[in-house]
């Protein structure tokens, strides 16, 4: 397994990755998704023999805040440490950044995963998060 910077947006591999985890709403506007990737702070991929099997995408200013926008690992590759490696790659790259944030599903599985890599729920820190969709 190789973790490295993601190169140019490849429609087929991104589509396959998003479909593999059921994130099909992102695929309804491919040109927007492609622009989002191009304008991201960083995108890092996980590769199994050159096959993209996981990806993490971060946005922000890279100085005071980094927001983990997407983290996806194909279902057959989950529970093998790939998500942790992707997160750690971003955390290492932006280790001096004051604040790193993400939004995720409110399940025990996801909360346990993010806590295991050093994240805290905002309410655990006396904060509240707001979102407008």
Where are these regions (language model features)?
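Conserved acetyl-CoA pyrophosphate-binding loop and the N-cap/start of the following alpha-helix
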Residues: 77, 81-86
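Active-site rim helix/loop that mediates acceptor-substrate recognition in acyltransferases
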Residues: 22-43
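Short amphipathic alpha-helix that is part of the acyltransferase structural core
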Residues: 1-27, 125
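Conserved GNAT acetyl-CoA-binding A-motif
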Residues: 93-105
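Hydrophobic adenine-recognition pocket in adenosine-nucleotide-binding enzymes
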Residues: 6, 71-73
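Conserved beta-hairpin
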Residues: 34, 41-56
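Conserved active-site alpha-helix within GNAT-family acetyltransferase domains
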Residues: 84, 106-132
